[in-house]
Design a protein with these regions (language model features):
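Amphipathic C-terminal alpha-helical segment
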Residues: 97-98, 137-141, 158-179, 191-202
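Helix-turn-helix
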Residues: 13, 17-55, 59
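Hydrophobic alpha-helical connector segments
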Residues: 59, 72-102, 157-158
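Helix-loop "lid/cap" segments that line or gate small-molecule binding pockets
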Residues: 77, 89-99, 105-115, 187-196
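Short, basic, alpha-helical segments at the C-terminal edge of helix-turn-helix-like DNA-binding modules
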Residues: 32, 61-69
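Conserved hydrophobic residue
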Residues: 27, 148-149
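Actinobacteria-biased recognition of intrinsically disordered, low-complexity terminal regions
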Residues: 1-12, 197-202
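Amphipathic alpha-helical packing segments from all-alpha helical-bundle domains
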Residues: 97-109, 115-145, 154-159, 183
Length: 202
């Protein structure tokens, strides 16, 4: 990035850079310099917007948790429409896995950042917690409409679905020959949920 050139959405530009650093080198190699080199900007730009690296990472964690939470909110009001499985897959994949993966890896490496996310967005209402809550509420609504088996446990299914998402984003190989993570997740969600919806149809 040439010096003197204005960068629109500086924060998002830096957030995208930290995602690439985590994706390539892992969260253990993070530094302010690594992020700014990846972003193609002067090191001082990061510190012009954030007090230090921890402040930057906390802001990034909150921003991406909000994105994930917003994607989960798409389930609200979908009960009774379309396919139960498709609705769930669309909501879980509303935020691209390429965005979810580095964020999740960072939170595993830096669990202290979760406290900052909860302080800003609320405990139990952000990130994976938001997906779990939205899925449980949606499945309960579908159960009430008879589209999910009366014996199904919405909370347990929601927890299992979030566990699948967490496993896929943390274990996925980003290499060119790796299986598509979205396809893996869709297949797993279908296998998890279809039994309950099939039972409801009989």
């Amino acid at each position: 990035m040439p010096r003197g050139v204005a960068i629109p959405e500086v924060r998002q530009h830096l957030f995208s850079a930290v995602e690439r650093v985590i994706g390539r080198d892992g969260p253990g190699r993070l530094s302010g310099r690594a992020v700014t080199v990846e972003a193609g900007v002067a090191t001082g730009l990061l510190y012009a917007h954030f007090s230090d690296l921890d402040d930057f990472l906390a802001a990034y964690a909150v921003d991406r948790a909000f994105l994930v939470s917003s994607g989960a909110s798409a389930l609200s009001g979908r009960a009774g429409e379309g396919s139960v499985t498709r609705n769930l897959c669309d909501a879980v994949l509303a935020t691209p896995l390429e965005t979810v993966r580095p964020w999740a890896r960072l939170l595993v490496a830096r669990p202290d950042l979760a406290g900052g996310v909860h302080a800003v967005l609320g405990a139990g209402t952000a990130g994976f917690d938001a997906i779990e809550a939205a899925v449980a509420a949606y499945l309960a609504d579908e159960r009430g409409l008879g589209r999910v088996a009366a014996t199904a446990d919405p909370a347990a299914l929601a927890l299992a679905l979030v566990g699948l998402l967490h496993h896929v984003v943390l274990s996925a190989d980003a290499g060119p020959d790796a299986p598509d993570a979205s396809d893996r997740l869709r297949g797993a969600v279908t296998a998890l949920v279809d039994g309950s919806t099939a039972t409801a149809r009989h």
